[in-house]
Amino acid sequence: MAHKKGVGSSRNGRDSDGQRLGCKKFGGEHVKAGNIIYRQHGTKIHPGNNVGLGKDYTLFALIEGVVKFERLGRDRKKVSVYPAS
């Protein structure tokens, strides 16, 4: 017989916070140089014109302009920033 009640499951009680990944600026939105457009793990979305790729795969604007999401071939996506006309 056990001398203590089954308290157990102390290995379960944790729930880590989300990492806030995803789209920060949407298509058609105006951005300034340096604004973060997309946070991701790996190149879910590739950098297009006037968009930089950080070491953690963050996509950011290199110039001031308007965000545009585009296709890159059949099964890839890219995001570009075009100067506002």
Curated annotation (Swiss-Prot):
Q: Which HAMAP family match?
A: Ribosomal_bL27
Q: Pfam families, per this entry? A: Ribosomal_L27 (PF01016)
The similarity comment for this entry is: Belongs to the bacterial ribosomal protein bL27 family.
Q: Which GO terms describe its molecular function?
A: structural constituent of ribosome
Give the top-rank taxon of the lineage listed in the UniProt record for this protein: Bacteria
A GO BP annotation: translation
What Gene3D superfamilies does its record include?
A: 2.40.50.100
Q: Where is this region: Disordered?
A: 1-24
Q: Which GO terms describe its cellular component?
A: cytosolic large ribosomal subunit
The record's section on InterPro entries has: Ribosomal_bL27
Q: Which UniProt keywords apply?
A: Ribonucleoprotein, Ribosomal protein
Name of the protein described by the UniProt record = Large ribosomal subunit protein bL27
